[in-house]
Amino acid sequence: MDELAGGGGGGPAMASPPRQQQGPGGNMSLSPGGNGAAGGGGPPATEGAGPAAGPELSRPQQYTIPGILHYIQHEWARFEMERAHWEVERAELQARIAFLQGERKGQENLKKDLVRRIKMLEYALKQERAKYHKLKYGTELNQGDLKMPTFESEETKDTEAPTAPQNSQLTWKQGRQLLRQYLQEVGYTDTILDVRSQRVRSLLGLSNSEPNGSVETKNLEQILNGGESPKQKGQEIKRTSGDVLETFNFLENADDSDEEEENDMIEGIPEGKDKHRINKHKIGNEGLAADLTDDPDTEEALKEFDFLVTAEDGEGAGEARSSGDGTEWDKDDLSPTTEVWDVDQGLISKLKEQYKKERKGKKGVKRVNRTKLYDTIADLGDDELPLIPSGIINQSRSASTRMTDHEGARAEEAEPITFPSGGGKSFIMGSDDVLLSVLGLGDLADLTVTNDADYSYDLPANKDAFRKTWNPKYTLRSHFDGVRALAFHPVEPVLVTASEDHTLKLWNLQKTVPAKKSASLDVEPIYTFRAHIGPVLSLAISSNGEQCFSGGTDATIQWWNMPSPNVDPYDTYEPNVLAGTLIAHTDAVWGLAYSGIKNQLLSCSADGTVRLWNPQEKLPCICTYNGDKEHGIPTSVDFIGCDPAHMVTSFNTGSTVIYDLETSQSLVMLSSQMDSGLQSSNHINRVVSHPTLPVTITAHEDRHIKFFDNKTGKMIHSMVAHLDAVTSLAVDPNGIYLMSGSHDCSIRLWNLDSKTCVQEITAHRKKLDESIYDVAFHPSKAYIASAGADALAKVFV
């Protein structure tokens, strides 16, 4: 047996006297872990001194070198193990810390990268805006000191903001500092202040014929036009300081904390007879304003000085310009801003005196026709200019009588059609009031500018900025032949289609299945209506959505009860769905229209008659029109939206007639000067009535869409709308937009006010040289739909 260090001492002790051997041997067996040590020398010791070992056990414990060494080794091993555990835990925590630090750094880098991208995009946008402005107006758009954005660290930005004194002016000083920092980030320097003061002088100095104004004129053109020739003076007059600041609109949507503080500083707004009184420190124009307030043009020009007045107007805050209706910020305790702007008051006073004299001499100056300007810009599709509050548009529309000059016939009206806001929150682009409610502009909605040319240039930008683009969302595929007609449920996202495959189908747009190879969704029909024995050509849904009417080549009108939108497609047959059949026509029924006011139905047929029905009565056919075919064969029919006691019918001869439903007499024949010629070119495919105005719109085989006044019967406007025959029309429930479908495979959306195309959608493929048969707006939801000869119906959102 191997002996440890303690056992080595037992060997020589055997030859020694027994008394000496006993102590170490006995003690070693009692020491901690010493049993193994006594193993080598224990037995000889107990043999020689066994009887004397008993009393030694009660003695105090004594430590030996072998026992101590063994204990130290044991403790050292335990310490090493705990230390290894601690090292592992520390490594794990350090790895966690490093991961979190890396994540934080990555987020910071991402933030910096996004900030850089934003700045670069702002820079690129300004470059594009300048390029576009030069192409359109032929002048350089002054954007201050346009240069590449510089990216400085957050620390330096923080040190730039000085600690403002804690006084009453702390709020607006912080706002000014914030704006100054914004200006530096986007490349504007203090020269913007000089440009703005020069702009004021340009309002007065460019029209100045005296020599002392010529120097200012040249300097201004050097600043604004980059050395352009004086030929652009007229255009420079039209552009005001708002143009210089138009690139600052990216600040309008910023969620600044200063906004609430600034709102607290706004005082009461003067109204009514006080509109011409200016309640704050002017720069030298107190007396002059009082002298000239009787002239509105003078008042307009003098209001251009308002952005020089208080520090709250900020260096470059376009939305803080004083509004033309007297909405101004009154803070008399603010310090004068002469040192801020560095304006030569003497020169300003002198120029104003000259302006006052000139105004007395030119009272009858002809102003630019605002509507012509608006129409021209609308035709150009001005997308790039910044948007302006809708209040400006309302003000501009009401401020002048708008003569439109699309055609000579249209100029007979002093006030052309203005398209108001209807109910239903205008899911389409909507009128200005609806836009304001949707966008929630709040106080910003009251801000206006007072220069005619300024918002004439920006007007179409507002329309385009709020423009909604329709995109295909659902494809309805279950028909086996061309889809001739479709109609939406008045409330639910439900659609009914009528097809040449002899059936009608009910679709719930909320029950969709993913399409195989496209981003759109396929919808399965939830019900199929079967009663016609030929192609179904026309369709109408009652105003409460409970009944549906369909007409076909079998000369019948089928009357249906609408199933529930949640009906099971595989449920048992329900005979109550078919409510009845209206029989009176002798040929195909090509058009249907329903009026919810008296629950009446109109139908037009290839037999030459137009019939009025009340399906609830025992003798449902109330009246028959055009029984002698005096106007030709009717092709389409509709109730007059603003006068339900009248209806309008189009004929294949090109004539359109308004009838009185009570007397059955024709009231007005709608005709245009060009309605003489071939019958095929005059053929009208569809007639619709505007929902709120006395206007009738017709779609023609010769690619035209024509607008008629119901009162005079004269054509208001005519336009070539498509590349092929126009087959279908629909007006949105608010009466702002018109949708047309054509055999050229396209759907076009038109602004009824400007008669311009807002959007074109290629929706269907041709089949036998025919494409789109019908289009429809949902009465209350953001859906439009089209029906095509390719057996598809498509829904857009």
UniProtKB/Swiss-Prot annotation:
Cite a single Pfam family from the UniProt record.
Striatin
Where on the chain is Phosphothreonine found, per UniProt?
A: T150
| Stretches for region Calmodulin-binding | 166-183
Q: Where is this region: Caveolin-binding?
A: 71-79
Cellular component GO terms held in the UniProt record: cytoplasm; dendrite; FAR/SIN/STRIPAK complex; Golgi apparatus; nucleoplasm; plasma membrane; postsynapse
Give the residue ranges for region: Disordered.
1-60, 313-336
Chain intervals with Gly residues compositional bias: 1-12, 33-43
Where N-acetylmethionine occurs, the residues are M1
How does the entry describe its membrane topology?
Peripheral membrane protein
Any Gene Ontology biological process: negative regulation of hippo signaling
Skewed-composition ranges (Low complexity): 44-55
Q: What is its main location?
A: cytoplasm
Instruction: Kindly state which keywords UniProt assigns to this record, in alphabetical order.
Output: Acetylation, Calmodulin-binding, Coiled coil, Cytoplasm, Membrane, Phosphoprotein, Repeat, WD repeat
WD repeat copies, ranges: 478-517, 531-570, 584-623, 679-718, 721-760, 767-796
At which residues is Phosphoserine found?
A: S202, S214, S229, S257, S335
Q: Can you name one GO molecular function term for this protein?
A: calmodulin binding
Q: How does the record describe its quaternary structure?
A: Tetramerizes. Part of the core of STRIPAK complexes composed of PP2A catalytic and scaffolding subunits, the striatins (PP2A regulatory subunits), the striatin-associated proteins MOB4, STRIP1 and STRIP2, PDCD10 and members of the STE20 kinases, such as STK24 and STK26. The STRIPAK complex can be extended by adapter proteins such as SLMAP:SIKE1 or CTTNBP2NL. Interacts with CDC42BPB.
Assigned protein family: Belongs to the WD repeat striatin family.
| Functional note | Calmodulin-binding scaffolding protein which is the center of the striatin-interacting phosphatase and kinase (STRIPAK) complexes. STRIPAK complexes have critical roles in protein (de)phosphorylation and are regulators of multiple signaling pathways including Hippo, MAPK, nuclear receptor and cytoskeleton remodeling. Different types of STRIPAK complexes are involved in a variety of biological processes such as cell growth, differentiation, apoptosis, metabolism and immune regulation.
- Please report the name of this protein according to its UniProt entry: Striatin-3
- Which organism's genome codes for this protein? Bos taurus
Q: What is the lineage of its organism?
A: Eukaryota, Metazoa, Chordata, Craniata, Vertebrata
Gene from which this protein is expressed: STRN3
